[in-house]
Each structure stands twice: as structure tokens, then as C-alpha cells.
Regions:
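Hydrophobic side-chain positions within alpha-helical transmembrane segments
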Residues: 18, 22, 79, 106-110, ...
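C-terminal transmembrane helix pair
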Residues: 257, 264-278, 282-286, 292
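Membrane-interface interhelical linkers
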Residues: 1-87, 130, 137-157, 161, ...
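Hydrophobic transmembrane alpha-helices of multi-pass small-molecule transport proteins
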Residues: 104-109, 118-139, 283-300
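Specific alpha-helical transmembrane segments that line the substrate/conduction pathway
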Residues: 69-73, 81-129, 195, 199, ...
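Transmembrane helical elements of multi-pass membrane transporters/channels
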Residues: 159-171
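Alpha-helical transmembrane segments and their membrane-interface junctions
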Residues: 168-170, 239, 243-261
Length: 300
């Protein structure tokens, strides 16, 4: 992996953690998330003018996979809003980012998508799961089933399920694009797909915002405050994706990208401690250590 790839991935990890920190600090609402999605749709809309990919004459499988992606994003966005209203970022962020690495292989293996996992990968997932069990506890002695039966854990699982769905279906949508447009470069296919995906996602969330009085009031509140935070978070979110796309051109194996992106877990926790002034506990330190070790075992 080149030095350029390393700095691009590090930049991406920092941006992802930062927009989550902004979301937590601003008490993110559905209107906030709709604005965030709109930024991605806006900057990528220009791709529609020079891409050779037409999205209105694709195979039926593409639309089915994209519906799966958008459903996952809906779960993710709603779960994220609720999770950050309930839990510290230093607890929620590492768990939300790592749990999909347990769920995604379960789905892809059961559906026969992708290569079978190694014994080391399964062992790594077990270590990740152990870390996730430790993260929300105040003390190790609190390790009891009833301490996991709460709204916070439900919202984290909702985010993780959403991430699992959109990651899995994104992969399949990209596969359909590769088969339909083999002559188009991978970067152009990815940018074209992101443009279509971002536009659909923004439309879905703005439709939800328009349908409910409370969410309409939240949107008006952001407008009255002239808050730039959703736009800053949206730029960070969009640049995160773009940085990953660019980094893929400088690595010999995309596993490196996946592995080093997990630096964001540590960055997110540190932002929770030092910027949001959240409590640093021994269980959080033990949990993040186990998660990072498990991730290394799984992706390397």
C-alpha cells in the first residue's frame, strides 16, 4: 500500500468519525440527516451529465438490490438518530461500526455471496462480539443479561442491521453494474452509482420529513437557526466516500482499505472523550481494544 493510500484512508476515517461527532453534538434529527444526505446528492449530481450509465434501463435485479440498499439506509438513519439521543458516542460509535462485521458474513455466507470465511476470520468475529459486550458496561461486574435489554442496545442493533443491509446490497448492485457496463471504469461506475443512490436517499428522507409535523418543525428549526452543521456533516460524509474511492486506486488489495478504515473507531471514541467530554471508563478501553484486535484478525 502506498503512502498516498494510507493518508487518504486515514483522512476518510477521521471524516467519518467527525460527522458522527457533529451529529451527536447537534442532537441529530431526521431533518438533520435528510440535509446531510442532500449534500451528497448535490455534489454528485453533476456525474449524471457525463456518465454513460443509464439507470432507467437496468435489469430488474439492479432495482431490487437498490431497494434493499435504501431500506438499509432507512434503518441506519433512523437508528442513528435514536442511538445518539440515548448513548454516548464513545460507546455507540465503535459498536455500530463493528457489529456489521458479524452480521454481513452471516448473510453473505447463507446466500452464497462471496468467498467462504477462514477460521481466523471467525475467531476475529468472536473477539469483536466480546468487545461489543464489554463496551456498554460501567463495570465488568455489570455483565448480566438484563443490562443489555434496553433501548440503547436496540437502536445500535437497528443501525448495525441497516449497515449490513446497505453494504450487502450495495455490493450486489455494483456487481450488476459491472456485468451491464464492463467497458466503464470502476471509478466511474462507483461515482455513477453513488449519484443515483444519494439522490434516491435524499428524496426518501425528505418525503418522511414532509409527512410528519414534528419532523417538519425540526427542519424549520434548523432553517431558523441558520445552522451550518448539517452541511458541514454532509460534506464530511461525502468526502469520506470519495476518499475511499480514490484510495482504492493506490492499493494492491482492497482488504487494506477495509482494515485501515477501522482507525475511525478509535478516532470516534477519542472525539467522544475530548470534544464531547464523555466519561472514559475501563470497560470502554477494554472493549475498543478487543474490537480493534478482532477487526485485525478478520480483515488481514
Amino acid at each position: 500500500m502506498t503512502l498516498s493510500a494510507f493518508f487518504l484512508i486515514l483522512f476518510s476515517a477521521g471524516l467519518h468519525a467527525t460527522w458522527n461527532m457533529i451529529a451527536k453534538k447537534e442532537r441529530m434529527s431526521l431533518a438533520f440527516y435528510a440535509l446531510l444526505c442532500s449534500i451528497g446528492a448535490f455534489w454528485s449530481f453533476g456525474v449524471r451529465f457525463f456518465t454513460p450509465i443509464g439507470f432507467f434501463n437496468m435489469p430488474a435485479k439492479f432495482y431490487l438490490m437498490t431497494c434493499g440498499t435504501l431500506t438499509g439506509e432507512l434503518f441506519y438513519g433512523c437508528g442513528l438518530v435514536l442511538a445518539y439521543r440515548t448513548l454516548d458516542m464513545s460507546t455507540a460509535y465503535p459498536m455500530m461500526r463493528s457489529l456489521p462485521l458479524l452480521f454481513i458474513p452471516a448473510i453473505t455466507t447463507s446466500l452464497g455471496w462471496g468467498k467462504p470465511l477462514s477460521v481466523q476470520a471467525y475467531a476475529g468475529m468472536a473477539v469483536i462480539f466480546a468487545g461489543c459486550l464489554v463496551m456498554p458496561l460501567k463495570e465488568i461486574s455489570d455483565f448480566k443479561p438484563r443490562n443489555y435489554l434496553n433501548r440503547g442496545m436496540l437502536f445500535i442493533i437497528l443501525v448495525a442491521v441497516g449497515t449490513t443491509l446497505y453494504t450487502t446490497f450495495d455490493s450486489q448492485s455494483q456487481k450488476v453494474l459491472r456485468e451491464a457496463y464492463p467497458e466503464v471504469s470502476a471509478t466511474m461506475r462507483s461515482l455513477s452509482y453513488y449519484s443515483f443512490r444519494a439522490l434516491m436517499l435524499a428524496l426518501i428522507f425528505w418525503t418522511i420529513v414532509a409527512c410528519f409535523r414534528r419532523t417538519r418543525e425540526e427542519a424549520l428549526g434548523i432553517w431558523r437557526r441558520r445552522s451550518w452543521m448539517p452541511f458541514v456533516a454532509g460534506c464530511c460524509s461525502s468526502l469520506t466516500y470519495l476518499s475511499v474511492l480514490l484510495a482504492m486506486n493506490f492499493v494492491t488489495n482492497v482488504a487494506y482499505v477495509q482494515a485501515f478504515r477501522q482507525l475511525g473507531l478509535l478516532i470516534g471514541m477519542l472525539e467522544g472523550f475530548f470534544i464531547l467530554k464523555e466519561q472514559c471508563t475501563l470497560t470502554k478501553i477494554i472493549g475498543i481494544t478487543l474490537i480493534l484486535e478482532g477487526l485485525a484478525m478478520t480483515v488481514l
